[in-house]
Regions:
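Metallo-beta-lactamase
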Residues: 24, 103, 113-232
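Conserved beta-strand hairpin/beta-sheet module of binuclear metal-dependent hydrolase folds
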Residues: 1-48, 119-137, 143
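Active-site metal-binding motif and surrounding structural segment of the metallo-beta-lactamase
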Residues: 33-77
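Rhodanese-like catalytic fold shared by cysteine-dependent sulfurtransferases
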Residues: 147-149, 155, 206-242, 246-248, ...
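Divalent metal-coordination and catalytic microenvironments
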Residues: 18, 30, 56, 68, ...
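Active-site metal-binding loops of divalent metal-dependent hydrolases
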Residues: 31-32, 57, 81, 113, ...
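Active-site neighborhood of phospho(di)ester-bond hydrolases with catalytic His/Asp-centered motifs
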Residues: 28-29, 49-58, 77-81, 108-111, ...
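Active-site environment of divalent metal-dependent phosphoester hydrolases
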Residues: 36, 57-62, 83-86, 114-115, ...
Length: 468
């Protein structure tokens, strides 16, 4: 049996190739949308990708089942409870896909979603009766389990799904041998759970000992535990869960229609008409010079989460980036189902050299120079509530970034406004958002709360108190 793990850091997403080394038949489990990596690897090993399995309809990314189906003519498989617009083969509890000396078997494990399955992989030569590995999707993570609260929109409550999850774990997964390898669909940083480990693989035995959600408890206690303290899900999650069930264009089609080079005048005209302009460069570069009223979401950070949270999927998007990274931006937006890119600024910021009237800058301030500001200062901590509770600048107010757009009115228009996050990535997003809304007294705290703690600063300026 051949198993290859593929990991996308930006989405904390793991997908897998499972192949039989005798027959050279391969299956891809929970593929990402840019599928060349699987096709190229299969070719290099002499494998043929005949099967594509989705453990469930993912909410945090668009899966690559359509792309693989069209590129390599593979069959698509879903759990028996799934309904979709495209053709697929239904996997009942116990359904088998034979690869050769390797057997894949579906096990229904609803809870994170109603249609969720776990895929068991058997090496028929070594042990045909017990699985060598299981691919748990979002049912069981390393150190956590899948959140049950993402499907209220389809009439299934978090309470009901949490109950299903308890039964799936207790009556299905935990009945398997301790030595079974566990390969989940997500790792640390994913918002599909609340405490995922950064491990890549574990055994069921280790999870039985150390995973808080697998400890002995009643069903009611489990439901209370799992439904509490889940992080707020990005706005695009519901949209992606639905789009994964639909017929849709392939990523190649999306990229082809999005790669349009536009001159400065066209970009500015479209911006004035209401088109969204995102600048994906690093915070320092954006601060130094950018197109007025553009939103900074750095491509080298948690781009998908914040783009999916702050951008409107129904309003056209224009991109400002280094030209050699534009296609990457389009692909990464496509991974979360944003098909509304209408083009990019030709030559990036070079195009604005002769248009200085369209250039703006964002003020940055260091932790050691805040006390030099004279007058009223409001420090806005845009980290999550939990981060703020774990430690914050005395006198600061907590407005998490994902709610900032709806709470700008709480921030005084007079005096100085300093925004910060933990390390500086999110705060430049916040600063650009505030400036886009007409605020011109905004400073970004370079290095964020980490820099503040490192320099052991105290707040001596007059810090404005506003309602949190």
């Amino acid at each position: 049996m051949f198993i290859q793990r593929y990991y996308l850091e930006c989405l904390s997403h793991a997908s897998y190739m499972v192949a039989d080394q005798r027959t050279k038949v391969a299956a891809i489990i929970d593929p990402r949308r840019d599928v060349d990596i699987y096709i190229n690897d299969a070719k290099s090993h002499g494998f043929e990708i005949k099967h594509v399995i989705l453990t469930h309809f993912h909410a945090d990314f668009i899966a690559g089942h359509i792309e693989l189906r069209d590129r390599v003519n593979s069959n698509v498989y879903l759990g028996a409870r799934a309904k979709a617009e495209f053709n697929f083969e239904s996997l009942d509890d116990g359904s088998v896909i034979e690869l050769g000396d390797t057997r894949l078997q579906a096990m229904e494990t609803p809870g994170h979603t109603p249609e969720g399955i776990t895929v068991l992989a058997f090496d028929k030569i070594v042990d045909p009766n017990n699985p060598y590995a299981m691919f748990t999707g979002d049912t069981l993570f390393l150190g956590d389990v899948g959140r049950p609260d993402l499907f209220a929109s389809i009439g299934v409550t978090a309470y009901e799904l949490a109950g299903m999850l308890y039964e799936s774990l207790q009556n299905k997964i935990l009945k398997l041998p301790d030595e079974t390898l566990v390969y989940p669909a997500h790792g640390a940083g994913s918002l599909c759970g609340k405490g995922l480990s950064n491990e890549t693989v574990s055994t069921l035995g280790k999870q039985r000992l150390h995973n808080y959600a697998l400890q002995p408890m009643t069903k009611d206690d489990f439901i209370t535990l799992i439904t509490a303290d889940q992080p707020e899900a990005p706005a695009y999650f519901g949209y992606d869960a639905v789009l994964n069930q639909k017929k849709r264009p392939t990523l190649d089609e999306v990229v082809k229609k999005s790669m349009k080079s536009l001159d400065v005048n066209t970009v500015h005209s479209l911006q004035k008409s209401g088109v969204q302009v995102i600048d994906v460069r690093e915070a320092a570069d954006f601060a130094g010079a950018h197109l007025c009223d553009s939103l900074n979401i750095g491509i080298d950070g948690r781009f998908a989460n914040w783009a999916g949270t702050l951008l409107n999927k129904d309003i056209p998007i224009l991109i400002v980036a280094e030209v050699n990274r534009v296609e990457e931006v389009v692909v990464r937006l496509g991974r979360i189902g944003f098909h509304n890119v209408k083009g990019y600024l030709e030559n990036g910021m070079e195009s604005l050299k002769e248009h200085t009237n369209l250039i703006s800058k964002t003020q940055r301030i260091s932790a050691t120079t805040i006390n030099e500001l004279k007058g009223e200062v409001t420090i806005v901590d845009i980290r999550s509530e939990k981060e703020w509770e774990d430690g914050h600048i005395k006198g600061s107010v907590n407005i998490p970034l994902n709610s900032l757009a709806n709470r700008i009115a709480e921030i005084p228009e007079s005096g100085y406004v300093i925004v910060h996050c933990q390390g500086g990535y999110r705060s430049m997003i916040a600063a650009s958002l505030l400036e886009k809304e007409g605020r011109r007294n905004v400073f970004d705290l370079a290095g964020g709360y980490q820099a503040w703690v490192t320099t052991k600063q105290s707040t001596n300026t007059s810090v404005n108190q506003i309602k949190n």
